[in-house]
């Protein structure tokens, strides 16, 4: 009797701990904001820059590669943005190019609430059309969900003040250069 009770207690405890660890799992991103893309990253993920080597790079991976416990399917991706080999931003986003099923699944919203904190989505979360910002560990995290011409645009954007400013500067410089190239 005592032996059966101990075995049942251990099984229940193990199942509880396993369930708790999976429920609180979060994506294990390639690296943290500001970290350098090293040779070991190159070996694992490939080189960042192409022929132009302008020190700006974006690489995209299926979210399931970095978030195996979150049931993200083929409609969810992670985009890493690098400036001078440093990770400047992470975007976890839903690809609704075919239909809105990724956003309608509520997976990204549930992930944001579970990992970064709850926020008010109104009476029906399916119709949430807004954003929420968290500031944590010298980073900011933005959950953004907006409806544009009947297509949901949904993402979690992670960066820091320093790298946000660098990205904004890079984009403004790119906009200045593009019209000059078109004139020639």
Outline where the language-model segments fall.
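Classical Sec-dependent N-terminal signal peptides that target proteins to the secretory pathway
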Residues: 1-25
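Hydrophobic alpha-helical segments, principally membrane-spanning helices and signal/leader peptides
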Residues: 4-6, 54-55, 68-69, 74
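Non-cytosolic coordination micro-motifs
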Residues: 25-63, 89, 94-184
């Amino acid at each position: 009797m005592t032996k059966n009770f101990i075995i049942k207690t251990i099984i229940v405890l193990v199942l509880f701990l396993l369930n708790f660890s999976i429920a609180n799992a979060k994506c294990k991103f390639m690296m943290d904001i500001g970290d350098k893309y090293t040779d070991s990253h190159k070996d694992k993920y490939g080189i960042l820059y192409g022929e132009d080597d302008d020190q700006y790079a974006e690489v995209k991976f299926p979210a399931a590669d970095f978030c195996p416990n979150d049931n993200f399917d083929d409609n969810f991706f992670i985009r890493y943005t690098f400036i001078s080999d440093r990770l400047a931003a992470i975007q976890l986003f839903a690809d609704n190019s075919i239909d809105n099923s990724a956003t309608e699944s509520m997976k990204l919203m549930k992930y944001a609430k579970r990992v970064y904190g709850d926020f008010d989505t109104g009476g029906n979360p399916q119709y949430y059309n807004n954003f929420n910002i968290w500031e944590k560990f010298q980073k900011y995290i933005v959950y953004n969900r907006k409806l544009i011409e009947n297509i949901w645009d949904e993402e979690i954007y992670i960066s820091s003040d320093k790298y946000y400013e660098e990205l904004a500067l890079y984009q403004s410089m790119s906009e200045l250069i593009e019209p000059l190239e078109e004139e020639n």
